[in-house]
Regions:
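The two-metal-ion catalytic cores of nucleic-acid processing enzymes
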Residues: 1-130
Length: 132
């Protein structure tokens, strides 16, 4: 059994935490995402508008970011694909339904109580202006 508990992009790598064969694992993965570019010949990939696109792999995550940036201002040339590479990694590594085992996942909840800001209501959590 294999499932993920957290996947993040850090720099040009995927930081992966999960459970494999009942053991917790952590890995730095040199992931190579796929992107898609317009194709004049029919392929098995199309855009949501029915236009054919071809699959390309520019390299690792940094290379993929550079590829997207290189073509972002080029007229009549679009680069398609998900640039949230952690989700691409999950889709590639865990296709279909993930077989989760809740007994293997550590779950915690932290709830703090804070005072009320002047004028009532709820404080802005990003500002941390109210005492705990």
């Amino acid at each position: 059994m294999k499932f993920y508990t957290n996947v993040e992009v850090w720099g040009g790598k995927i930081l992966y935490r999960g459970v494999e064969e009942g053991r917790r694992v952590r890995h730095r993965v040199d992931y190579h995402p796929s992107l898609f570019i317009p194709s004049k010949t029919p392929t098995k990939y199309t855009t949501i508008h029915g236009e054919y696109v071809g699959k390309v792999s520019p390299g690792n995550i940094r290379d993929a970011r550079d590829f997207v940036k290189q073509y972002e201002d080029v007229d009549n040339f679009k680069v398609y694909g998900n640039t949230r590479y952690q989700y691409c990694f999950i889709a590639d590594e865990f296709p279909g339904t993930v077989d989760w085992d809740i007994t293997q996942i550590k779950i915690a909840n932290i709830d703090i109580e804070v005072g009320e800001p002047d004028g009532g209501g709820f404080p802005e959590p990003d500002l941390s202006l109210i005492h705990i």
